Amino acid sequence: MPRIREAAQLGLVAAVLLVGSGPERVVPGATAAEVDATIQPVQTQHAITVNGKELSYTATAGAVRLRLEKSDAEASVFYVSYRKDGEDAARRPITFVFNGGPGSSAAWLHVGALGPRRLLLSDEGTIPEPPARLVDNPETWLRFTDLVFIDPVGTGFSRAIAKGEKGGDEEGKAFWGIKSDLRSLGEFIRLYLNHNGRWASPKYLAGESYGGFRAAALAELLPAKGGIELNGVVLISPVIEYTLNMGSDYLNLMPWVTFVPSYAATAFHHGKYRGAATDLKSVTEEAEAFSQSQLLLALASGGSRKSQQVAEVLAHLAAITGLDVAEVQRHRGRIPAEIFAKRLLEDRGRVVGIYDGSVSTPDPNPFSAGYPARDPSLDPLVPSVVSSFNGYVRDELEYRTDLRYDLMNPDVIQAWNWAEADLGELPGVGPRLRIGLSLNPKLKVLLAHGYFDLATPYFASKYVVARLELDEEVFPNLRLTVYPGGHMFYTRTDARQQFYRDAKALYEMSSMTPQR
C-alpha cells in the first residue's frame, strides 16, 4: 500500500523523530523484572505560587502494566499525574495528555505548557544559556484540572515487556500502529480510572500533533468501546486528515492550498510579504480566500486555462508567500514546506523552521539545494527538554530508574503500521470527530494552532471543520483558535497565556462546576 507508506515521510513525523537520534536508537523491550522494579508509583508533595496564592498538589510518577485485548502483547506505560490537594475527585476534572509523532513522549506538553513546572524560555520561546532549568508555571492547567501525562509504548520510560530474558524491540511493534495504539491508550485510561477512583470525574483529553489525531479518534472510540464519557477534547497543532497535509500526489491538490496561509504569515513576519494586507490577520484571511479559489482553480485546470491567467495566479502566490516568481513557476504553484523554508530567506543566507516559520538561523548547509537535516525551530529545544525532564523526574518527583527517557524514538515511526487506516487510504479522523460530537452534544472541542506552523498548518484544520457538516446545535461546541507561534506555539509567553485562557473557558463551559 504505497500511499500509506508515504505517510511516514510526512515532514512533521520525520523531522521530529530523526532529530538528535544518534547512531544507536533501538529502544529494547523491558524484561518483566525491569518492569516490576519501576512500576510501583512514587508520590511526592509539592506547592507552587500563582498570583500570590499557593497551589499545593500531589504528584505521582509510575507505570501501568497492560495487555492488548485479544493479544499476549504486554507493556509498562509510564505516566506522571498531578492532583490538586483538597479537591473532591468526583467533581474535579481530570485530563489525559499525550504528544504525537508517533514516537514522541509527553514531555513536550508536560514541561512546555501544561504541567506545574515549565522549562524556562524567553518570551519569544528561545532557550537561555545551559543548563536548562524549570520554573513554576503560572499557566499550568492544574489550576482547573488534574493532569495525567502518558508516554505511549516505546517513548519516555514506557516499554513493551519482552518475552525472553533479554529485551528486544519486536514486542513493541504490537503497539505501533493506528488501531493498536488507540487500543493501548484507551486501556491505560480505563485502568487509571479503576486504580484511582476517577470514574465520576469530568474527563478530558489533550493531544498535540499526532496526539491530536489520537484524541479526535478517542472522542468517538472511548464512549463506544470503553463506556468512558468525555466532557472535552483539546487538539493542539493536530493533523486531522493526512490527505490535507501531504502533497506527494499531484491529483491531490488540497495540501498545496492548506499550507499557503501559513506561508503568507511567515513571509509577513520576515518582511518578505508583497501583498496588500497590513496585519497578520488580514494577511492570512486574504491568503485563505485566494488559495481555495483562484489558486485551487489554477491547479485544477492543468493546461486547460490560458497561460496568462495561470501566470497571474502564480505571480500573486509569489507575492504573498515572499518567494521569487521563478521559484513558484518552477514548482507550478505546488510549494513543499521544505522548499519554502529553504528559499524564503535565501538571499540573507538563512533558513526558517518548519515547526516554526518565524524562527530563522544561518543556513548550516548553504551549498546544498535541500533543506537542512536539522530544524532550527525544533533541534535547539530537544536537549533542553530532555535534560530538564530527566533531572525533574528523578530529583523532584523522586522516580528512580536506569531506563533511558526517550523524548523521541525513530524506531516507532519506522515500524508504524499505517495500513491500519480504513480502506487503505491516508489516515484521517474527521469522521470520528464528527461522530463523537454528534453522539455527545455536550462534548466541547478546542482546536489550537500556530500561524507559523509549517508542519501541521492551521488552515487544514479550518478546512476540515467547515466540512464536518455538524448540526447547528452541535457546531458551537467546536472552536478553532490560532496563536502567534509555530507547532509548539506555547513556547511563546503571549501565546501560552492566551491558550491557557481559552482552555480554561472550555473547561468552565463543559464541567459540572466553575473552576477557580
Where are these regions (language model features)?
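Catalytic-loop region of hydrolases
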Residues: 26-94, 106-108, 112
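N-terminal cap/lid subdomain of alpha/beta-hydrolase-fold enzymes
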Residues: 71-176, 466
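Conserved acidic catalytic loop of the alpha/beta-hydrolase fold
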Residues: 183-201
